[in-house]
Amino acid sequence: MCIRDRFAIIQSAIVTSIAVIGKGWGPGATEAGVFIGNRSMELFVDIAMTTIAAGMVGLALSALARSQEQIMPLLVVAIMSQLVFSGGMIPVTDRIVLDQLAWLTPARWGFATSASTIDLTRLVPSPLSPNDSHWHHTSGAWWFDMAMLVVICVGYTGFVRWKIRLAAAN
């Protein structure tokens, strides 16, 4: 585990603590997480894994940019696409292009793990929220979402290693 991942985990712990202690769970919240049992700890794991995967996207963008001037436009596009493809603001489920592109973003799977942990489909039933199978409060949905975050981390890590090897060869 690198220093970047440690900072991501610490930041996730701070954000989760502020949200849980400051805001509380509120009425109607699920009593337990899907897999871990402790909903606060599971929410922390969701956010920490999402933060680590998002950090890998940042590393991939850094490897892609050839100069410092190129990185800012890439970051703007990456951040805006994360907002769109998470599925929280704009439903991506069953939308032909959005649904497929969302599979490449950590925000999609991070939001899905958190939605699965807090049972978002029960808290905000359709038609206000999409009937996304990845948001269901089941261990299968939660594990699939987590596995997708791991796949994204591995994929972007492989891309970064490939770009670094190309740069070293030149």
Predicted regions and their residues:
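Membrane-spanning alpha-helical segments of multipass transporters and channels
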Residues: R4-N170
